[in-house]
Amino acid sequence: MLQPKRTKFRKQFKGRIHGTAKGGTNLDFGGFGLKALEPNRVTAREIEAARRAITREMKRAGRVWIRIFPDLPVTSKPTEVRMGKGKGAVDYWAARVKPGRIMFEIDGVSEETAREALRLGAAKLSVRTRFVQRIAE
């Protein structure tokens, strides 16, 4: 699963996800993509599950680009532990996703295959998404 090799600090504040995506809103690599329609945190497990579903449907043909990276450490305290005594240990890594962000791109397959692959991948994610494709020039 994806996670940073090293970070400046082990733990981060929770933060809020305001506004729409400033960058990463256009298809830069592939011909088809999956665009987020709502703000949310997407975990590294979700990203990996979606990647597997997409590559399986594409039958190893074409190419997949993951445009988001889980760089936010999410902490949790063990069960039945009283409040206080510091912040919990890092439980998993997540990526903050804003509306308009392209999360996955694929190329080298037909539109029907791309549509079905991204539909299966979107089912693994905790955000509503839309299928997008490059405008023929």
Swiss-Prot record:
Single GO term (MF): structural constituent of ribosome
UniProt keyword annotation of DNA-binding present: no
CDD domains: Ribosomal_L16_L10e
Pfam families referenced in this protein's UniProt entry, alphabetically: Ribosomal_L16
Biological process according to GO: translation
One of the record's GO cellular component terms: cytosolic large ribosomal subunit
Domain of life the protein comes from: Bacteria
The entry's keywords: Ribonucleoprotein, Ribosomal protein, RNA-binding, rRNA-binding, tRNA-binding
PROSITE patterns to which the protein is assigned, alphabetical: RIBOSOMAL_L16_1 (PS00586), RIBOSOMAL_L16_2 (PS00701)
InterPro entries: Ribosomal_uL16, Ribosomal_uL16_bact-type, Ribosomal_uL16_CS, Ribosomal_uL16_dom, Ribosomal_uL16_sf
Disulfide cross-links: none
Listed SUPFAM superfamilies: Ribosomal protein L16p/L10e (SSF54686)
Subunit structure: Part of the 50S ribosomal subunit.
Function: Binds 23S rRNA and is also seen to make contacts with the A and possibly P site tRNAs.
Family named by the database record: Belongs to the universal ribosomal protein uL16 family.
UniProt protein name: Large ribosomal subunit protein uL16
Organism: Mesorhizobium japonicum (strain LMG 29417 / CECT 9101 / MAFF 303099) (Mesorhizobium loti (strain MAFF 303099))
Taxonomic placement: Bacteria, Pseudomonadati, Pseudomonadota, Alphaproteobacteria, Hyphomicrobiales
